[in-house]
C-alpha cells in the first residue's frame, strides 16, 4: 500500500520485473548490472528473524551487491535502527555512505526507521542534508565503538 503511493506504483509499470528468490544468490550470480539495489530484508543488519539472511549483511553480501551495481549505481538498506558496525562494513567495502532517519508510515508502532544509501561515487548520493543523521560524536568515557 505505502510503497506504491510513495513510488508511483512501480508494480503497475510494464518495465517492472519481479523476481522471487534469494537476493544474495541473485546479486552474486547476476551478469546484469543494476542502477539501484534496495534491501528491505528482515529487520536490517541486526535482529535477524531468519539467520539465513545474515549473509546478505556480511562482507560477502555487500561486495556482491557492489559488484552487481553499475558504476553510478547505489545501494539502499532499510533498518529498524542505526548500526555503526554495519556503517563501517559499508565503508570498508569501498562505499561512500549516508544514513537517513525516515518517518514510519502512519499507524506503525515505531516513529522512525533508518536507510543507508551507499555508492562508490559520493556525488550521486542524495543530498537532502535535513534527513541525514551523522554518526553520534564520541563522548568522554564512551566505550561504544565508532
Protein language model annotation of sequence segments:
Residues 29, 34, 91, 98-146:
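SAM/dcSAM-binding transferase cores
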Residues 81-93:
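Short alpha-helix
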Residues 80-81, 105:
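Short, surface-exposed acidic/glycine-rich loop or hinge patches that mediate macromolecular interfaces
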Residues 49, 77, 87-89, 109, ...:
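Short linear functional motifs in flexible/disordered or boundary regions
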Residues 1-69, 77-78, 93, 102, ...:
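The AdoMet/dcAdoMet-binding core of the Class I SAM-like
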Residues 73:
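Glycine-centered, small-residue-biased loops immediately flanking beta-strands
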Amino acid at each position: 500500500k505505502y510503497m506504491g503511493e510513495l513510488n508511483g506504483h512501480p508494480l503497475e509499470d510494464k518495465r517492472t520485473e519481479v523476481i522471487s528468490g534469494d537476493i544474495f544468490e541473485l546479486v552474486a550470480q547476476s551478469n546484469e548490472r543494476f542502477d539501484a539495489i534496495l534491501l528491505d530484508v528482515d529487520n536490517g543488519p541486526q535482529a535477524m528473524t531468519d539467520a539465513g539472511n545474515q549473509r546478505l549483511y556480511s562482507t560477502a553480501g555487500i561486495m556482491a551487491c557492489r559488484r552487481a551495481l553499475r558504476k553510478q549505481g547505489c545501494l539502499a538498506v532499510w533498518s529498524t535502527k542505526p548500526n555503526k558496525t554495519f556503517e563501517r562494513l559499508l565503508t570498508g567495502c569501498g562505499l561512500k555512505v549516508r544514513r537517513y532517519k525516515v518517518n514510519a508510515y502512519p499507524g506503525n508502532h515505531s516513529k522512525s526507521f533508518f536507510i543507508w544509501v551507499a555508492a562508490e561515487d559520493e556525488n550521486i548520493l542524495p543530498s537532502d542534508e535535513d534527513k541525514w543523521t551523522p554518526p553520534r560524536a564520541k563522548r568522554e568515557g564512551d566505550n561504544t565503538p565508532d
